[in-house]
Every structure is written in structure tokens, then in C-alpha cells.
């Protein structure tokens, strides 16, 4: 049975991603900053007859929490087949000219450094998989090209901190994929689309089912699948790739 760790999986897109991977026969380590919320999510899925999962407390912004999660999962499996770095925060819609630097640091600590922490912590388990997959959940708001295109439908939506954190995540994904280019790894930045979740007060047009399906698609890639790409069905439905 293949295994996957999903961070921020107690609700919304992460939760639905867990459900869809469970339906494909994966064993899921459902990561949640709050263990209580994670346990509640596990019980909901078990009530649907999806039993191959367990909650893992993991705060991606906390070194000790990530290390503890690695120890806990390491007691249960020697191999991790997929890592979905889904946990993220928005930071609201601040002004770059006046927002305290602490807000920038907080968002980057989760959206970028959190991904680095978790990926490094679980790299040894991923390396033991014959088909390791890493999905870094990004956003079209991290695209420099789109933000410079006045015809883009979200051109005026300048997320002053969230956007740069995802741009940085995209570059990290490129470098990680390059470093792992001669291995079986597939590492991609995947935009699930503007989805109706509590992350955006349910303002997005997409559904969590559609968003999760995109993440699952790239978490289960075949050996000939892409790596080091910025993937988005929304921004480039004809190619599946988003402009950087």
C-alpha cells in the first residue's frame, strides 16, 4: 500500500485530497497543526468507510513539531511515496508600504520555509520509494508573468505577501526538481485553482473536489510525468502549465 503525507489536511482542499487518495488505495498521514482537528477529520473519513489513515500533529512553521512528526511517522513506515505540501496561510491583503515585517516573516515561515522544513525532514523516507512524488501547493498569484499582464482576470488582485511567498515556492520547486533530476522523483508546483474555501471566505468559483483532483493527479504521476513544472488547469487549460 502506497503512503502519503498531506500537511494542512484537516479541512478544505487538503481534506478532500486525503479522501481522494484514500479512494485510490493510499495510506494517509493526515497532517494538522491541531491534533484535535486532525482526529476529527480522520473520524469523518472513517465514517465514510475510509479507514487507512491516521492524524499527525504537524505545525510546519515549528522545527520541533516537524521533527516530532517525522519521528512519529518513522515508527510506522520506512517509505513515504508522496508528500503534498498543502499547509499555507494568506496574510490578508496588506499594503507593502506599511505592513510590519513580522507579517511577511509569518507568511513566508509557513508558505516557503514550512515546505523546506517538511521536505527535508521526510526526504529519507521519500528516497526509499520507487516512485516518490512531491506536490508543492502554489497559486496563480505567484506568477510574475500573469501579474504583469493587464488582461489577466486577477490582475488587480495583488496579494502583497501571499503572492511573493508562492513565487518563492515556485523557484524552490524548480531547484529541488533540478537537484533530484537523476532520480525517480517528480517534484511540481501545482495550482489547485481559485477554490471556494474558508481561506478566501468561499469566494472562489472552483470546488474542493476539482482542486483536490489536480493535486492527486500530480501526486500519482507515472514515471514519464513532468517534473519541475508550475501546473495550472485554470491559467493554461490547453497545456496544463502556468507561466512563471
Regions found by a protein language model. Name each.
Residues 89, 93, 97-108, 127-181:
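Catalytic loop of short-chain dehydrogenase/reductase
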Residues 50-52, 72-85, 91-92:
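A glycine-rich helix->loop->beta "capping" turn
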Residues 35, 56-71, 101:
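The beta1-alpha1 cofactor-binding region of Rossmann-like NAD(H)/NADP(H)-dependent oxidoreductases
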Residues 84, 118-122, 126, 172-173:
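Hydrophobic positions on the long internal alpha-helix
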Residues 24-40:
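Conserved glycine-rich Rossmann-like NAD(P)H-binding loop of the short-chain dehydrogenase/reductase
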Residues 167, 182, 189-190, 197, ...:
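C-terminal helical subdomain
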Residues 1-29:
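Canonical Rossmann dinucleotide-binding motif of NAD(H)/NADP(H)-dependent dehydrogenases/reductases
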